[in-house]
């Protein structure tokens, strides 16, 4: 209903954020128990747009756990127009680096496990307003790392599109996907691998 309301309110872009995102800027109960996984969120948003004949007219952007070219390919195949990345970009910039492990330990965590980005005490100097911490971020090196990450993600996406016989990543479609488990098939609305069966479709 949220997508329908957004479109009726005049939105020209809808952003769907699945529960697999890396945020810690909320209560634990929200992180663990609120929201739905990203792929079914995409499917439901696309269905809502299609019902209003607004799919591809209103842009659909997907975020929440997008880390690899395969994640992007799945989102585009299900009908998204674009994706947004958050935590993966922070890590590409240099967050969670073992270089700052002692600093992470000093604030009660460890490199690779810290997720309190909202507190402003990021040892890597990325998500902070503290001038001393901010000096730790080398914007040139960080920019190169982020560019490398996005280039690799794009190459993975293009490779998967080619493997599906597509000339462009935006030509990916649900028919290019199968699921490996019944749960994934039901959530994403694609057939279970080796069958034409989509659990829950047509009441079966």
Regions found by a protein language model. Name each.
Residues 1-130:
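Glycine-rich phosphate/ribose-binding loops and adjacent secondary-structure elements
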């Amino acid at each position: 209903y949220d997508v329908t309301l957004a479109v009726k309110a005049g939105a020209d872009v809808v952003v769907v954020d699945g529960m697999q995102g890396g945020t810690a800027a909320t209560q634990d109960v929200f992180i663990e128990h609120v929201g739905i996984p990203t792929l079914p969120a995409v499917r439901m948003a696309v269905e809502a747009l299609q019902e209003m004949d607004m799919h591809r007219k209103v842009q659909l952007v997907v975020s929440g756990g997008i880390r690899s070219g395969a994640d992007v390919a799945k989102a585009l195949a299900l009908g998204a127009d674009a994706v947004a990345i958050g935590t993966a970009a922070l890590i590409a910039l240099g967050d969670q680096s073992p270089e700052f492990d002692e600093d992470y330990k000093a604030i009660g965590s460890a490199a690779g496990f810290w997720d309190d980005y909202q507190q402003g005490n990021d040892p890597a100097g990325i998500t902070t307003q503290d001038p001393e911490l901010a000096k730790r971020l080398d914007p040139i090196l960080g920019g190169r790392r982020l560019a490398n990450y996005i280039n690799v993600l794009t190459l993975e996406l293009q490779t998967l599109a080619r493997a599906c016989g597509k000339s462009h990543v935006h030509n990916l479609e649900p028919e290019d996907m199968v699921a490996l488990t019944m749960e994934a098939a039901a959530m994403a609305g694609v057939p279970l691998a080796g069958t034409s069966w989509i659990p829950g479709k047509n009441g079966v």
